Design a protein with these regions (language model features):
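Secondary-structure edge/capping motif, primarily at the C-terminal ends of alpha-helices
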Residues: 26, 64-68, 121, 125-129
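Helix-loop "lid/cap" segments that line or gate small-molecule binding pockets
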Residues: 44-51, 58-69, 148
């Protein structure tokens, strides 16, 4: 269980670092670029740091399924996911606010939706035989991300 948690935590830390990098890479443009450009670039930067190979995608999915099956792993897994989700939600909601935007739903729910879209599109791409560098995950993630934003009141 400790090994599974370590791998899942490392994956979450990698995703967090990718998101931080995407936001940092956009910080100079946040007040001048269009929403579509910012979302597109943020998603592109995030995806460029992700591992898309079959082995890694399958291993990550199997680890999550293992957490679902093993009651002893669940409390730590749930706590780790909650912690990482809070960090992601804070990071992306603050970045959105810098652009004069906010989410149409609570940021934690937005993170959950974005994660589900990314995971589903990536896994379905592998099942359907799409190339690892297929634009589909990024296009779908950007479209959903944009659809969850609205101007600040």
């Amino acid at each position: 269980d400790a090994l599974c948690l370590a791998v899942l935590s490392a994956q979450a830390q990698q995703n967090l670092a990718a998101t931080e990098g995407a936001i940092a890479g956009l910080s100079d443009e946040m007040t001048t670029a269009s929403v579509d450009d910012l979302v597109g670039r943020a998603v592109q930067l995030f995806l460029s740091s992700q591992r898309h190979d079959l082995t890694w995608v399958m291993a990550a999915s199997e680890l999550r399924l293992y957490a679902a099956r093993e009651a002893s792993l669940r409390p730590e897994y749930v706590a780790d996911v909650a912690h990482m989700s809070e960090l992601f939600a804070t990071m992306i909601s603050e970045a959105a606010a810098q652009c004069g935007l906010t989410f149409i739903l609570p940021p934690l729910e937005a993170v959950s939706v974005l994660q589900a879209v990314y995971e589903h599109t990536t896994i379905m791409g592998l099942i359907e035989g799409a190339a690892p560098d297929s634009p589909a995950p990024g296009d779908r993630l950007a479209a959903v991300f944009r659809s969850m934003l609205r101007p600040l009141d």
